[in-house]
């Protein structure tokens, strides 16, 4: 198998209102925290257990930034597809720090609003990246193009 794949798919809830910042060039970037919760039944005690994992999400895609600005708030349920990236920086004391983030920045990125409160306010595709390949869009099929006669 040639090449490699870096793809993250998450379904979870936004932990706090998304934070928007603007670069020096005027490009908008959104940061948000997404919680995913795993539940299971303990084999010994039969208790229901759960563990929540928090994910840092950074959105560079203009189309997705626009959707998040308008519709996403604390508690919103999202489906996201992006890639995993680790960033390095130096803190105020010069110490190297690292953070790993789910990044949505290219045509392979997706964000879908799963809340019923949000889905009534816009059409289903408004949450998808505008950078998707045209062949991945939904196309309706017109049955009138088919011949009525069976060829055998």
UniProtKB/Swiss-Prot annotation:
Residue ranges flagged as DNA-binding region: 54-60
A Pfam short name: SSB
Regions of compositional bias (Basic and acidic residues) in chain numbering: 125-144
GO biological process: DNA recombination; DNA repair; DNA replication
UniProt xrefs under Gene3D superfamilies: Nucleic acid-binding proteins
GO MF annotations in UniProt: single-stranded DNA binding
HAMAP family according to UniProt: SSB (MF_00984)
Subunit and interaction comment: Homotetramer.
Protein name: Single-stranded DNA-binding protein
Organism: Rickettsia conorii (strain ATCC VR-613 / Malish 7)
């Amino acid at each position: 198998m040639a090449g490699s794949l870096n793809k993250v798919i998450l379904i979870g809830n936004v932990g706090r209102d998304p934070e928007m910042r603007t670069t020096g060039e005027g490009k908008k970037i959104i940061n948000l925290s997404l919680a995913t919760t795993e539940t299971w039944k303990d084999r010994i005690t039969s208790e229901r257990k759960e563990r929540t994992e928090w994910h840092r999400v950074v959105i560079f895609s203009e189309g997705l930034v626009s959707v998040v600005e308008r519709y996403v708030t604390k508690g919103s349920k999202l489906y996201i597809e992006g890639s995993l990236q680790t960033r390095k920086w130096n803190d105020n004391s010069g110490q190297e720090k690292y953070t790993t983030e789910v990044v949505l920045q290219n045509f392979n990125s997706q964000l879908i609003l799963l809340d019923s409160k949000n889905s009534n306010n816009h059409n289903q595709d408004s949450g998808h990246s505008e950078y998707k390949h045209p062949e991945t869009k939904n196309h309706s099929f017109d049955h009138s193009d088919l011949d009525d006669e069976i060829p055998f």
